[in-house]
């Protein structure tokens, strides 16, 4: 049963405690990466058979396989995927940054170029569930950014095939190439390249502890989006909130995995007790009841705060991945929210809207990193470079100042480089 904690009656350490993974996979992942770097495709085939139970003759998904998969998906779901993709595109198109140039008409031009990364790599998990939503959320921003190529990796089933809904989403998103490989070995292949899989410049997408560790280890060789921790939801709710709705929203994250975190912060002790009871009613009805039960019992909590203002302060300190504001006039509180991955406003905005359909991205910072990190966006798939142009007359006006500055830092060659051109012109 979920715990109820009264703020001020328990230690702050208990209020702000986070789910932490005890699994250490650093050594195993390091060995896998080294194997893929050395043996390329041969290592990937080996790991596909070992971990996925699939004996493959080719890593690449063919156009025929994609068409066959799309034909196998029910038409209603294809319509929903296309509608979701449209919403995601509409939102992310507003994120596009433009290059700029500043010409002060005194012989000086400075500017900034916004340039997409050449090739982006998308990791899509397999395992206990298929996530076509991840395909859309992680690839559409890359396509909008203008990446020359978007490559996807995802583990196959034992039959050597990729889940049809994953391939259907990939076709809708316009992904260029797809490969049947998952786990740390897939991350290694994207980072270093193999005979079949091209090296990418950016790797994005969630995964298990092995995938997260692999992304951590290859960072620097390649850019990554973030190191994702367990899924999180925090609901700030007043006494008018329907406890059935609050419990359902908590369970929407608790069913993800046993390490997921579900937290309710409320100024109503009556709501706290009602939600606690409602969770016990709803959990046995879930298909993933065992996972949700473990998550709620081990990592869930209901915090009773004296005021909604303090509830907001608690939310800011926890900086959750998903934050629901189940209160009257939620926009009155928006300016007070400083740290959250994504905010869901009002009583009619379950977090599931953001997971699938609304348009804002669902790849979000976890484990408190929303204090300094942002959701996945078009920005993740571009880089910026800057440029400077001076005429000889413009240089002459500032060369002595530049030289003086450089000399103060003890870099006389810097100083000379600023003045030598003027000496040549005498």
Task: Give the label of every model feature segment.
Residues 1-118:
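N-terminal Rossmann-like NAD(P)+-binding subdomain of aldehyde/semialdehyde dehydrogenases
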Residues 226-298, 302:
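A conserved active-site cap/scaffold subdomain adjacent to cofactor or substrate pockets
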Residues 174-244, 248-252, 256-261:
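Conserved NAD(P)+-binding/catalytic subdomain of aldehyde/semialdehyde dehydrogenases
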Residues 102-168:
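Conserved small-residue-rich beta-alpha loop and adjacent elements
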Residues 97-102, 260-265, 285-296, 326-327, ...:
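Flexible, glycine/charged-enriched surface loops at secondary-structure junctions
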């Amino acid at each position: 049963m979920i715990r109820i904690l009264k703020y001020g009656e328990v230690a702050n350490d208990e209020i702000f405690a986070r789910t932490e993974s005890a699994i250490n996979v650093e050594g195993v992942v390091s060995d896998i990466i080294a194997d893929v770097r050395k043996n390329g495709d041969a290592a990937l085939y080996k790991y596909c058979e070992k971990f996925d139970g699939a004996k493959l003759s080719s890593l690449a998904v063919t156009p025929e396989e994609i068409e066959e998969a799309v034909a196998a998906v029910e038409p209603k779901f294809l319509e929903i995927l296309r509608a979701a993709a449209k919403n995601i595109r509409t939102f992310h198109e507003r994120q596009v940054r433009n290059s700029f140039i500043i010409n002060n008409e005194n012989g000086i031009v400075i500017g900034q170029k916004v340039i997409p990364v050449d090739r982006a790599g998308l990791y899509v998990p397999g395992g206990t569930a298929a996530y076509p939503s991840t395909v859309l959320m992680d690839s559409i921003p890359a396509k909008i950014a203008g990446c020359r190529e978007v490559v996807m990796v995802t583990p196959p089933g034992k039959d050597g095939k990729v889940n049809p809904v994953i391939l259907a989403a990939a076709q809708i998103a316009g992904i260029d190439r797809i490969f049947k490989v998952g786990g740390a070995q897939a991350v290694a292949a994207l980072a270093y390249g193999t005979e079949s899989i091209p090296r990418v410049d950016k790797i994005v997408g969630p995964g298990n502890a092995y995938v997260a560790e692999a992304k951590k280890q290859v960072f620097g060789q390649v850019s990554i989006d973030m190191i994702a921790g367990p899924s999180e939801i925090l609901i700030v709710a007043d006494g008018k909130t329907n406890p059935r709705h609050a419990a359902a929203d908590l369970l929407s994250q608790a069913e993800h995995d046993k390490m997921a975190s579900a937290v309710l912060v409320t100024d109503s002790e009556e709501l706290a007790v009602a939600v606690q009871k409602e969770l016990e009613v709803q959990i046995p009805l879930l298909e993933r009841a065992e996972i949700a039960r473990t998550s709620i019992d081990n990592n869930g909590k209901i915090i009773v705060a004296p005021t909604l203002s303090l509830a907001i302060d608690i939310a800011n300190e926890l900086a959750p991945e998903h934050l629901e504001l189940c209160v009257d006039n939620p926009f009155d509180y928006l300016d007070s929210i400083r740290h959250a991955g994504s905010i869901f406003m009002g009583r009619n905005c379950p977090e599931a809207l953001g997971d699938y359909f609304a348009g804002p991205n669902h790849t979000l910072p976890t484990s408190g990193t929303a204090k300094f990190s942002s959701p996945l966006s078009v920005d993740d798939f571009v880089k910026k470079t800057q440029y400077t142009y001076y005429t000889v007359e413009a240089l002459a006006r500032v060369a002595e100042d530049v030289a003086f500055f450089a000399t103060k830092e003890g870099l006389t060659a810097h100083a000379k480089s600023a003045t030598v051109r003027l000496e040549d012109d005498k």
